[in-house]
Amino acid sequence: ERETWVSFPELKARTASVAGGLAAMGVQRGDTVAIVMPTVPEFTDVFFGVIHLGAIPVPLYPPVRLGRLDEYHARTAAMLTQAKSSVLVTDDRAGKLMGTTVTACDTPVRIVRASSLLKAAPVAAAHTQPHDIAMVQFSSGTTGEPKPVALTHAQVLANASAILDIEPDDDGFSPSGVTWLPLYHDMGLIGCIFPALLYPASLTLIPPEAFLAKPAIWLRALSRYRGVI
């Protein structure tokens, strides 16, 4: 089992570099940037890098299965078009399939690897207001086509704060989270990442595919990192 550790200062520095890379591409404040990545450290770099720039991240689920790819490409292209994203950030694994997706979009979409953005010079953080849009989240599409929902910074922080309200009010309590929920999902991102940063607390992320292949990895991580959430 391979581990990658990222500290809060490292995350801050990496997000500033991602923001610099996006700015060099011409991404501006208020633009939407699609993110199609699995559970990897670069996901949070990119997500918060987009916010750092004052742009709006749009997390979309990656092609986790090779079956039904035609349906995946069509649905993802429709979401990219609805979100009006002209830039899609991905990694090497998911990026191999994104070319087919963007060709199905109504407007041009540029694909960029997260690894290239991390090499850019950092830029200062944009000044945002509580009513500014923080992210666009798509509904699951269980009963119809996925629909975009714009969430403001105030709404996201209120949700994270409400989750933290259930934590014990004890000075000696040191929370540590362990999750295998996907980061493009609201529970993985809003339910786990945001509260961990707001508290702040350590958080161990397990790729969903690793958990599905070996569920015991979750229990081992809970024991190893003393997870209580």
Locate the predicted segments by residue.
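Conserved AMP-binding/adenylation subdomain of ANL enzymes
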Residues: 157-176, 186-228
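AMP-dependent adenylate-forming
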Residues: 1-7, 134-136, 143
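A short helix-loop-beta submotif of the ANL/AMP-binding
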Residues: 19, 40-65, 73, 78-87, ...
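Conserved AMP-binding/adenylate-forming core of the ANL superfamily
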Residues: 1-48, 65-72, 127-128, 151-157
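Structural motif
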Residues: 36-38, 89-94, 181
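Conserved pre-ATP/AMP-binding loop-to-beta segment of ANL
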Residues: 119-138, 144-145, 150, 155, ...
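Short, well-ordered beta-strand segments
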Residues: 32-36, 51, 134, 176-178
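Structural core segment of the AMP-binding/adenylate-forming
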Residues: 24-25, 52-121, 126
